[in-house]
């Protein structure tokens, strides 16, 4: 089968023919040619979208060359005036002046619209072919960093900036920097709202129909690209391709810490910050810092309340429509993502992915201080506070720090003895809702995870694994000082205080300190004149002191 070249499928118009087309026909021509080029790409022709656009612009330049010839032969400008304005309707290069002065090749007489086009043409006489509009397979400019090839020097230089981080084009409105002039122009539409394609839902404007079409899907919920591996769907082909890297691991940018791969250096750099802790985007109002500009923008909306997408229930603003849809599920209770293992449902895909690691045992996030591994990044960040003590919520009794107020509030109850959650079956009380839910499984026997030895049920796989150690006798936590081994990480932490002498619990009334929260609580009750624990057995009532062996529970 003969190879197919772009000129074999291209439809070229003369000046007179083009002038007879109405705007809708011209638009149809553009759409058909773009689709034709993409079909060629599917059967073996490979080129960048930029090359398609360059070829298309070249067709416009050919038409303009015809126009120039018509102008040079005609004494009356108005004979070609209407055709001229219609050709400019192509919007291929808005900066082309009304009177174009063509550049002529001195070797063959061929005429070009730009000096750069003439320079490329002259190289063809000299035997150099750095770029040829007719040979789309040729990409002589290869990136040394990632191996990606380009057909034009301009595209290659623009790509190199993704590696160097150079962003020479800054937005005069907000200061955000970009690697190319087209990028900053597209960004400026956010400020001016002057794009030719405007969303009827939110008013956001775009300079290209493809971007506008993708954006519309954020409102309609349409996701035409579905992953055959996990059935997750996406609104755009680039999003789908980035997702596939998770399955194949074939991205050109691979993290040395965790092995995760990425298709773009910008995403790779942001990911690296999750390991280094770097947060270059800082909020001037509250001092909170972020690893990415997108996260920073989302945060700023909390201060300004000025996001483009607002929750219809509570009015909270968001930067993306996907964020507001996710948030609205907190009001509706909708949980569309289901775990294939246990049937548990979640409101977001990220939450179900994190949950699935409790089944697989995967813990990709490791603490650099002690080596402990975690299933999610927030988990390892919360854990790091134990080492750094830098959490925003600090306990006044023992000095322990926390990253969120709910965790801090639960911890405070270990000092005050408050247990607001009481079991209606046996009367036992708990400091948190999570603990009473775990306890209720003892009564109902209805937990999703059951011990294979005794049938006891649990609410999460980590709990059943810990319980199974009571049958196997496994004690994976060993004290480095004395060699004593323990079933639980919490048990060894409490035991280590016998070596260090640490007593984190201090009585505010007399200053006495304690190693264990249970000892501290008993002491506080002595000040208050409260009796420790009263148990009723039939008609008998008696006081009991909890055994030290249970202090870690």
UniProtKB/Swiss-Prot annotation:
Pfam families in the cross-refs: KRAB, zf-C2H2, zf-C2H2_6, zf-H2C2_2
CDD domains, A to Z: KRAB_A-box (cd07765)
KRAB domain mapped to chain residues: 4-83
Swiss-Prot/TrEMBL keywords: DNA-binding, Isopeptide bond, Metal-binding, Nucleus, Repeat, Transcription, Transcription regulation, Ubl conjugation, Zinc, Zinc-finger
C2H2-type zinc-finger residues: 103-125, 141-163, 169-191, 197-219, 225-247, 253-275, 281-303, 309-331, 337-359, 365-387, 393-415, 421-443, 449-471, 477-499, 505-527
Subcellular location as annotated: Nucleus
Disulfide partners: none
Lineage: superkingdom: Eukaryota
Molecular function GO terms recorded: DNA-binding transcription factor activity; RNA polymerase II cis-regulatory region sequence-specific DNA binding; zinc ion binding
Record keyword Ubl conjugation present: yes
GO biological process, one term: regulation of transcription by RNA polymerase II
GO cellular component: nucleus
Span of the signal peptide: none
Glycyl lysine isopeptide (Lys-Gly) (interchain with G-Cter in SUMO2) crosslink location in chain: 438
Protein family membership: Belongs to the krueppel C2H2-type zinc-finger protein family.
Function: May be involved in transcriptional regulation.
Name of this protein: Zinc finger protein 564
Organism encoding this protein: Homo sapiens
């Amino acid at each position: 089968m003969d190879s197919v070249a772009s000129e074999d499928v291209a439809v070229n118009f003369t000046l007179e023919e083009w002038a007879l087309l109405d705007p809708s026909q011209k638009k149809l021509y553009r759409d058909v040619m773009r689709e034709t080029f993409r079909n060629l790409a599917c059967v073996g022709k490979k080129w960048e979208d930029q090359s398609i656009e360059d070829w298309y612009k070249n067709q416009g330049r050919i038409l303009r060359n015809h126009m120039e010839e018509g102008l040079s032969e005609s004494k009356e400008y108005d004979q070609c005036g209407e055709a001229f304005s219609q050709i400019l309707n192509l919007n291929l290069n808005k900066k082309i002046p009304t009177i174009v002065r063509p550049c002529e090749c001195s070797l063959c007489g061929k005429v070009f619209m730009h000096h750069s086009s003439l320079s490329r043409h002259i190289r063809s006489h000299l035997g150099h072919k750095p770029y040829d509009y007719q040979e789309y397979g040729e990409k002589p400019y290869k990136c040394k960093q990632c191996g990606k090839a380009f057909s034009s020097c301009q595209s290659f230089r623009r790509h190199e900036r993704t590696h160097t981080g150079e962003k020479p084009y800054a937005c005069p409105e907000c200061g955000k920097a970009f690697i190319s002039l087209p990028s900053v122009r597209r960004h400026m539409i956010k400020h001016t709202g002057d794009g030719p394609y405007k969303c009827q839902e939110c008013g956001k404007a775009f300079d290209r129909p493809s971007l506008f079409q993708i954006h519309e899907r954020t409102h309609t919920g349409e996701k035409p690209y579905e992953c055959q591996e996990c059935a997750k769907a996406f609104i755009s082909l680039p999003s789908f391709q980035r997702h596939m890297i998770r399955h194949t691991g074939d991205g050109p940018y691979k993290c040395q810490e965790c092995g995760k791969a990425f298709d773009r250096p910008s995403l790779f750099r942001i990911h690296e910050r999750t390991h280094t802790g770097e947060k270059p985007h800082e909020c001037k109002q509250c001092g909170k810092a972020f690893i990415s500009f997108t996260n920073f923008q989302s945060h700023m909306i909390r201060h300004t309340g000025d996001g483009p997408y607002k929750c219809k229930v509570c009015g909270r603003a968001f930067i993306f429509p996907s964020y507001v849809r996710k948030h609205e599920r907190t009001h509706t209770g909708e949980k569309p993502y289901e775990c294939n293992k246990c049937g548990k449902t979640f409101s977001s895909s990220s939450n179900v992915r994190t949950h699935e690691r409790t089944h697989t045992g995967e813990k990709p996030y490791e603490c650099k201080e002690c080596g402990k591994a975690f299933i999610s990044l927030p988990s390892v960040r919360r854990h790091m506070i134990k080492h750094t003590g830098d959490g925003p919520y600090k306990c006044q009794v023992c000095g322990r720090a926390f990253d969120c107020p709910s965790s801090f509030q639960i911890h405070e109850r270990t000092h005050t003895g408050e247990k607001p959650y009481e079991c209606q079956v046996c009367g036992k009380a708990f400091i948190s809702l999570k603990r009473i839910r775990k306890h209720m499984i003892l009564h109902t026997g209805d937990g999703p995870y059951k011990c294979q030895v005794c049938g006891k049920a649990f609410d999460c796989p980590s709990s059943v694994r810990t319980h199974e150690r009571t049958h196997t006798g496994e004690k994976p936590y060993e004290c480095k000082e004395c060699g004593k081994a323990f079933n639980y990480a919490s048990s060894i932490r409490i035991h280590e205080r016998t070596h260090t002498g640490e007593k984190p619990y201090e009585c505010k009334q007399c200053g006495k300190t304690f190693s264990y929260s249970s000892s501290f609580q008993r002491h506080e009750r002595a000040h208050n004149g409260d009796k420790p624990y009263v148990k009723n057995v039939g008609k008998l009532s008696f006081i009991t002191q909890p055994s030290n062996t249970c202090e870690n529970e």
